[in-house]
Amino acid sequence: MFYDMVRGWFKKSAGNYNAFVKALLINDVEAMNEYMNVISEEIFSNFDVGTKPSKLQPERLVSCYDCNGVANGSSLNDSSNLYAMTRKSSRFYHGFVLGLMVDKRDDYIIKSNKESGFGRYDVMMIPRDTENSNLPGLILEFKVINHSMEKSLEETVKSALQQIEEKKYDTELLKAGVKKENIRHYGFAFEGKKVLIGTDE
């Protein structure tokens, strides 16, 4: 459901939903940031409270944690609820990025909100063929800025990357046969419409 909605949004715009995935796989962090900020601005411009009717039907948006096409969580009934939620949690961005990622289901096992190491990662992408493929194993962690603890999005990205390391989220990828040197970590930090993506490489 969420996958279909994401694709539907891009049909109405000039955006290419594959561009982000391509940038991710070649580790082009600059392109990832540019893409996500353009899309974030476009999406949230349509949800500004009291400005104009939403083109994106916010009542259909749900939190998505199942890449097999099953969307879970409560639907959002108005734009103010959506905007408030995205300021307080990373669930919307989590679901949105998952909607982009599932296009790679043939190459990756895509998991979300599962246990690995000493905690639960947000998104993990495990190459289906770990022996004959050069595809990297990927871990994505999402955080909304906590102004009581962080002064900038850069600090939020750092916090996300530290969590990946401290909680040993690599454990599942390593058990699946992905080599340590072929694992990448990405921290996603959010503040309103602003997005910052960073890596520990």
Regions found by a protein language model. Give the residues of each.
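Domain-level recognition of nuclease-like catalytic cores that cleave nucleotide substrates
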Residues: 172-201
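Extended alpha-helical interface modules used as scaffolds for assembling large macromolecular complexes
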Residues: 1-168, 195-201
